[in-house]
A protein has these predicted regions:
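Short gly/ser/thr-rich secondary-structure transition/capping motifs
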Residues: 55-63, 130-132, 187-189
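The first long alpha-helix at the start of the GST-like C-terminal all-alpha domain
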Residues: 7-18, 104-107, 111-116, 183
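Catalytic core of membrane glycerolipid acyltransferases/transacylases, capturing the structured
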Residues: 22, 26-29, 37-41, 55, ...
Length: 245
């Protein structure tokens, strides 16, 4: 068993009965997809995510919901710590959001269903041309009002509350859509499914003030990536300092 996978393995075992319900409901909701609107499909995705949260003995505290922009599309950009990250955000974000995920990871059980239910996108890391096409599509969708969840780090390596390198290319969507970027800070999210402890845990989600287009329009993708990372790093350090970490 991989390092830090014991907790996740127990969640998988406990989730097996619910998985049968999930598969049946997802198939019903997606065939044909137009039978169920975006909101109904998103509520099912939230149910799936919330079921996993309960089985992982996780409580998530959410801060800054008032910072989410109104009447416009936007892109959520969180740090990445583990398997629970997207689940926690979907649970806490009342309006439907779509998710961008690496293609191979997106084909796994639960991820596959959540991506379908949220009208998300699958990004092939080995096909640069397809990547550009998908990012353009996301930019157009966000311009038309859709909300997207994108992890600039692209993955996680048991980094816990430490940031990794941000991939500047994903910020193409923001320049194309000219919409706000909402930096999101995840604290202790790794504890939910990427640890060996079976004790209840508490994670935090902090939605920071959005970075408006006027603030980043004169930057290039690398500078914008640095700006978003800096906002997340500052808040993360503040939170860790508050608890004496």
């Amino acid at each position: 068993m991989k390092k830090y996978m014991f907790r996740f393995a127990t969640v998988v075992v406990k989730f097996t009965p619910a998985a049968l319900i999930m598969l049946a409901k997802t198939n019903t909701y997606m065939k044909p997809p137009e039978k169920y609107d975006t909101d109904k499909r998103y509520r099912l995705a939230q149910w799936i995510c919330n079921t996993l949260r309960r089985l992982s003995l996780t409580k998530t505290q959410v801060f800054g919901l008032e910072n989410l922009p109104k009447d416009t599309g936007y892109i959520l950009c969180p740090n990445h710590q583990g398997k629970y990250d997207a689940l926690g955000i979907v649970i806490s974000h009342e309006e439907p959001i779509s998710i961008l995920m690496e293609e191979k990871q997106s084909r796994k059980l639960v991820a596959n269903q959540v991506i379908d239910l949220t009208d998300g996108k699958r990004l092939p890391f080995d096909d640069p041309k397809k990547q550009i096409q998908i990012l353009k599509e996301i930019g157009e969708e966000v311009k038309n009002g859709r909300k997207y969840l994108i992890f600039p780090e692209g993955g996680y390596e048991y980094n816990r509350n430490t940031l990794q390198k941000f991939n500047a290319g994903c910020f193409r969507c923001s320049f194309d859509s000219k919409t706000p970027i909402v930096p999101v800070v995840l604290l202790d999210s790794w504890k939910a499914m990427n640890s060996n402890s079976l004790m209840p845990c508490v994670t935090q989600i902090h939605y920071l003030k959005p970075i408006e287009y006027d603030e980043y329009k004169d930057l290039n993708k690398t500078k914008l990536s640095d700006l978003v990372k800096e906002r997340i790093q500052e808040k993360l350090e503040e939170l860790l300092k508050e608890r004496g970490a």
